[in-house]
Amino acid sequence: MNDTVTIRTRKFMTNRLLQRKQMVVDVLHPGKATVPKTEIREKLAKMYKTTPDVVFVFGFRTQFGGGKTTGFAMVYDSLDYAKKNEPKHRLATHGLYEKKKTSRKQRTERQNRMKKVRSIKKASVGAAGKKN
């Protein structure tokens, strides 16, 4: 980790309902490339005395000319709360969720079955396709 990289948090909020701390993160990195998210996660985990697996960072934008990047971070109280509240795509980037992918042929057959019916019956046709 670079010593010249500074991480500041602002708009800090403790969200008791979702068991997390949420904040806007400013990363100051003058004369350097954008800092990797993994590095930011590790530094935030050290700041809030927790492990990096419960820290979720996203939405980073580097200002024109570089030197400053702003994003959003959430630090959960435990991994269970994180799995419950975080969107699936964000869990997937952490390696905590894997989507069950059906074969292309099954998806196409299901799509074609759904084309043959109209309105709310599509749901029952789609569900029947999942059972097989």
UniProtKB/Swiss-Prot annotation:
Give me the ranges of the annotated region Disordered: 91-132
Q: Which intervals carry biased composition (Basic and acidic residues)?
A: 96-112
Give the highest taxon in the source lineage. Eukaryota
The name on file for this protein is Small ribosomal subunit protein eS24
PANTHER family, from UniProt?
A: 40S RIBOSOMAL PROTEIN S24 (PTHR10496)
The signal peptide here is: none
Which source organism does the UniProt entry give?
A: Oryzias latipes
Instruction: Give the subcellular location.
Output: Cytoplasm
